[in-house]
């Protein structure tokens, strides 16, 4: 039976944590959202793209996955963020549109943000996330997977929930070369740690409230009325006021993280299959609890966590 302390791969829910790292650097005066990213990654061959555009998926850049699939010679060797940047330099794929001329959700934006965090902070992305974010709010079970650079390992990480592909029979999800790209995915965490992050947002423990609020502002003013807008690492619901969320899917895992501020509700769902609840069913859970979950609902020690956060000298804030 799974519990709140079991660790899963978050897939694209990782993006909200990458965005938080960027906001932390901005709050310290180290990063300007509207500066060209070539001022941070000077070798990057596309000008006119800002950190803000990466955060809101408005860069227009084409998918790195397509580049790697076409040109990476040995799929047993990890493809890293540095390799990704090198491939954009080498092959210069045509962007989908000019910077800030549209919205296109793409993993490349958040993979580049991880590289931005590294260049600005002087730390590796996994180290920055651990030392500056996870440790700061006692997310003790959370980490960024750092794949060995030489060859693929056969499985994921010990003590983490194994992912599965649901075909005729469940098949273990194997490690693969794109798992070395960080920022867009490949963060591991559990329900309790993720709830700590949600409370840390409420109490302004990572960035001031004025900066945190920018994460929940629509990044595309002329966005389709039929789709939910996107802020900094969060989707913004068009159906529910003051409701923000993100889905995740990647190689044997699905995830969903939602905060409903008006009703003071948080919904965190982590699964270890690539096929499980649909996006519609996620929303049904929030709206009317129409979906039955097995084995049972889990009670999170909300009061205990909130009380620990309220008092900064408690053990919760220990590094």
Description of each model-found segment:
Residues 252-253:
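Short, small/polar residue-rich loop motifs at catalytic or cofactor-binding pockets
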Residues 256-274:
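Short, well-ordered beta-strand elements
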């Amino acid at each position: 039976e799974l519990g709140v302390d079991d660790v899963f791969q978050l897939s694209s829910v990782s993006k909200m944590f990458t965005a938080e790292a960027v906001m932390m650097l901005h709050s310290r005066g180290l990063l300007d959202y509207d500066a060209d990213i070539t001022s941070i990654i000077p070798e990057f061959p596309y000008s006119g793209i800002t950190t803000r555009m990466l955060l809101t998926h408005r860069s227009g850049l084409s998918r790195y996955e397509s580049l790697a699939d076409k040109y990476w010679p040995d799929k047993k060797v990890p493809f890293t963020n540095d390799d990704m940047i090198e491939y954009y330099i080498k092959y210069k794929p045509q962007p989908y549109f000019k910077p800030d001329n549209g919205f296109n959700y793409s993993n490349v934006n958040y993979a580049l943000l991880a590289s931005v965090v590294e260049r600005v902070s002087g730390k590796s992305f996994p180290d920055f996330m651990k030392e500056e974010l996870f440790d700061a709010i006692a997310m003790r079970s959370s980490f960024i997977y750092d794949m060995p650079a030489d060859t693929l390992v056969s499985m994921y990480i010990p003590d983490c929930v194994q992912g599965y592909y649901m075909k005729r029979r469940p098949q273990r999800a194997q490690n693969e070369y794109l798992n070395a790209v960080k920022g867009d995915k490949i963060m591991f965490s559990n329900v309790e740690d993720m709830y700590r992050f949600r409370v840390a947002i409420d109490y302004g423990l990572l960035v001031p409230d004025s900066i945190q609020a920018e994460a929940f502002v629509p990044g595309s003013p002329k966005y389709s009325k039929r789709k939910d807008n996107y802020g900094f690492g969060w989707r913004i619901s068009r159906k529910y006021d003051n409701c923000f969320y993100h889905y995740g899917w990647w190689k044997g895992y699905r995830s969903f993280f939602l905060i409903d501020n008006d009703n003071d509700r948080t919904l965190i769902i982590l699964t270890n299959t690539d096929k499980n609840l649909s996006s519609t069913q996620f929303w049904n859970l929030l709206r009317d609890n129409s979906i039955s979950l097995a084995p049972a609902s889990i009670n999170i020690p909300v009061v205990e966590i909130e009380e620990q956060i309220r008092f900064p000298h408690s053990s919760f804030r220990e590094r």
